[in-house]
Amino acid sequence: MTKIIFMGTPEFSVPVLTQLASTYDVVAVVTQPDRPVGRKRVLTPPPVKKAALELAIPVYQPEKLRTSSELEELIALEADLLVTAAYGQILPNSLLESPKHGAINVHASLLPEYRGGAPVHYALLDGKTETGVTIMYMVEKLDAGDMISQRKIPITDEDNTGTMFDKLSKLGAELLMDTLPDFLAGKITAIPQDPEKVTFARNISREQEKIDWTKPGRTIFNQIRGLSPWPVAYTTLEEKPFKIWEATYEETKESGEPGAILADKTTLKIVTGDGTLIVPTVIQPAGKPKMDIHSFMSGAGRNLSKTTRFGE
């Protein structure tokens, strides 16, 4: 049976691991170290570690794999293939070149578009109507290896980064399992990435999280769903942070300055730069838990003045 080392960390990686383990001999799982989580800073294992332990697969958690003692241990396993999915570290050539069939990665974009750590976020932020998964060879350069297979999936207005992570995770696992038989048999010719079409999906900055109400409504709508459920887009209300977790978009145009409020007892609408409307459905005022808009409008939202504007 084909011996595989699997490397991954977040929930996205779990379906890939479980599918692999159902058919192949996964001899080791490499993931990030346990990290403190939440206000109480409880030391918490990555989702992949939990899944690996349930499957009785040995787990390695080096802080920096490149300089760790675990690196030589992994090479000594003499695996046939290395598979990664959102592991979180660039791997040294000594490991990439050690397996018989090399090292491949499950990446959540249609490469060469969106190399990097936040491809799902950027597909939504940019208003894409489709994205997908690419399986490619791993090289030391970030997400630059030749492409082995690729599969597309639509993005709807109802999707956000959370829903697309779930869909792409399952799609990636399916594509990998469909690809491996021919790949291991040497029947697939990998395709180089077109360097002229390369774009990058770098980690989201704090500045990207802040809503600029002078921008068009569709752009703001894409920002809100692209940053939901993490790290979450925010604005200010009476100079205090105000997060918008979920919202809908209305193309109906209204007069009013960007950030102006149109409200009744149960709904809140915000005017954008082109006059179209953002309609928040799940929000989080400063110092409060997140809540649906009806709860907000029946409480603190009742006191909103018609002259109040978001972003001031």
From Swiss-Prot:
GO terms for cellular component: cytosol. It catalyses: L-methionyl-tRNA(fMet) + (6R)-10-formyltetrahydrofolate = N-formyl-L-methionyl-tRNA(fMet) + (6S)-5,6,7,8-tetrahydrofolate + H(+). This is Methionyl-tRNA formyltransferase. Attaches a formyl group to the free amino group of methionyl-tRNA(fMet). The formyl group appears to play a dual role in the initiator identity of N-formylmethionyl-tRNA by promoting its recognition by IF2 and preventing the misappropriation of this tRNA by the elongation apparatus. It comes from Listeria monocytogenes serotype 4a (strain HCC23). The keyword Iron does not apply. Belongs to the Fmt family. PANTHER family: METHIONYL-TRNA FORMYLTRANSFERASE (PTHR11138), METHIONYL-TRNA FORMYLTRANSFERASE, MITOCHONDRIAL (PTHR11138:SF5). The keyword Cytoplasm does not apply. NCBIfam families: fmt (TIGR00460).
